[in-house]
């Protein structure tokens, strides 16, 4: 029996409606700055690059920026060395572009959504549960047929160790070719219909940027567990849980100065952050957390 639900409201609209309701109780601070990583040295050298919005209260929100030419355009518009990019901007206004913006606007919008979420969580004293493993508490056994949306090399090893089956759905042909070369024994495809037989699905939060989450949920009717994980998954989870997502695994920045320095230097910022995992069954709901 599928755990999925259907919702007529586009996910971006649901997220923005929720943010507006929360902002009535918890007005948002302005943007302190947009953090952009140093440009990758060679095409394909980095599989994951993120930008971050920092708010004046020290809250952070992350977003993936390797879709299309997002990174190039962000660098052209703001430059990784600019210390005042988007300073004093209204994060609620930036967030609105999640619904109808271009690839750059949507990336910045998701970072703003995540920063707004982090800001309220900090103010109300909510700390999301720590992730028990690097993949958002996803536990696998030999009976599992895992579907991956986007590529998680650590999960490939974990499936192999557990003796389970693995199907990978990628979102661009270039990544399919690269991953098939790296892992020739794994099915890597652009066809989301390949998820039909998977009982567990793990997808990157990039699905929020390219608006593919609802399509992927529909393509995996047998999935009893559907996790959305990654640094971009730092938002209130209600809209995702309403659709059938069972786990949200995100990243919180815990040392803003160290994070900013690492991103500016093109170094790993994992030591300045913590991974968390929120399950649908344990989530009390946004109204209770926000005191609404």
Predicted regions: what is each one?
Residues 152, 172, 232:
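Residues in the short beta-alpha loop(s) of Rossmann-like NAD(P)-binding domains
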Residues 2-161, 278-292:
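Electropositive, gly/pro-rich neighborhoods at or near active sites that engage anionic ligands
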Residues 164-179:
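NAD(P)-binding Rossmann-fold cofactor-contacting core
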Residues 225-292:
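C-terminal functional extensions of proteins
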Residues 134-135, 185-197:
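Short acidic low-complexity segments
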Residues 155-158, 212-219, 239:
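A short acidic, amphipathic alpha-helical/loop segment
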């Amino acid at each position: 029996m599928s755990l999925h639900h259907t919702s007529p409201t586009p996910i971006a609209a649901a997220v923005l409606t929720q943010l507006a309701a929360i902002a009535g109780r918890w007005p948002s601070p302005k943007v302190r700055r947009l953090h952009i990583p140093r440009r990758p040295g060679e095409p394909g050298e980095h599989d994951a690059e993120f930008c971050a919005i920092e708010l004046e209260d020290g809250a952070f929100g992350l977003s993936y920026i390797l879709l299309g030419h997002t990174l190039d355009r962000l660098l052209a518009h703001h430059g990784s060395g600019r210390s005042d990019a988007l300073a004093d901007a209204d994060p609620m206004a930036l967030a609105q572009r999640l619904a109808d913006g271009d690839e750059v606007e949507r990336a910045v919008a998701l970072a703003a959504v995540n920063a707004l979420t982090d800001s309220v969580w900090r103010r109300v004293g909510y700390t999301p549960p720590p992730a028990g493993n690097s993949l958002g508490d996803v536990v696998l056994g030999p009976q599992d047929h895992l579907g991956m949306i986007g590529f998680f090399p650590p999960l490939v090893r974990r499936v192999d160790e557990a003796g389970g089956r693995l199907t990978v759905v990628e979102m661009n042909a270039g990544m399919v070719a690269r991953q098939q070369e790296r892992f020739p024994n794994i099915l890597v495809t652009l066809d989301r219909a390949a998820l039909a037989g998977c009982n567990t699905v793990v997808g990157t939060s990039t699905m929020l940027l390219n608006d593919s989450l609802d399509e992927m949920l529909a393509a995996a009717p047998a999935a009893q567990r559907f996790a959305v994980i990654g640094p971009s998954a730092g938002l209130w989870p209600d809209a995702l849980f309403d659709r059938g997502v069972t786990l949200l695994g995100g990243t919180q920045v815990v040392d803003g100065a160290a994070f900013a320095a690492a991103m500016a230097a093109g170094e790993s910022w994992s030591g300045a952050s913590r991974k968390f995992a929120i399950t649908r069954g344990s989530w009390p709901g946004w109204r209770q957390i926000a005191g609404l």
